[in-house]
Amino acid sequence: MKVMERWFNVGKIVNTHGIRGEVRVISRTDFPEERYKKGNKLYIFRECDTEPIEVTVKSHRVHKSFDLLSFEGYDSINDVEPFKGAMLKVPESQLGELNEGEYYFHEIIDCTVVTEAGETIGKVKEILTPGANDVWVVRRQDGTDALIPYIDDVVMHVDPERKIIIIRPMEGLLE
């Protein structure tokens, strides 16, 4: 593993679940079904360790607002108890390619949003996933938030390298 590799947070282990080695995870990944697929490698980062612990996903299921994961070789509550409070991460090399028009959250967060007319709206501070399409929360220069739906009629161009998003606001969108 490269020492200088960038790591991306995909979840936080907040507790154990049951006695068979499952952990409760608050997910921070864009694609939980993909990221937590059986056989995938994840890395556990604990404050007390100098190196991450590599684990292999044995099972994944959703329970209430949590993702429940179990790992190969960690079969009891005693095995996973030390992981409480730890972060689950993946190296940048594991992110994989996306289809055209798809972006990882970290590519969109902190992008500057500008209208086609050149008016700067603000920076994307978070992404909501309420249903049919994502909604980008943009912090305006006056401190208020604008909600920008990620749909073709509004988002004209995304340039993650330059951290610029060009939009065509619908009537009333920015009021």
UniProtKB/Swiss-Prot annotation:
Tell me where in or outside the cell this protein is found. Answer: Cytoplasm
User: Biological process GO annotation list?
Assistant: ribosomal small subunit biogenesis; rRNA processing
- According to the lineage, what is the superkingdom? Bacteria
Task: Name a Pfam family for this protein.
Answer: RimM
GO CC terms: cytoplasm; ribosome
Which Cys residues form disulphide pairs? none
| Ranges of residues in domain PRC barrel | 100-173
Its annotated function is as follows: An accessory protein needed during the final step in the assembly of 30S ribosomal subunit, possibly for assembly of the head region. Essential for efficient processing of 16S rRNA. May be needed both before and after RbfA during the maturation of 16S rRNA. It has affinity for free ribosomal 30S subunits but not for 70S ribosomes.
**Protein name (database record):** Ribosome maturation factor RimM
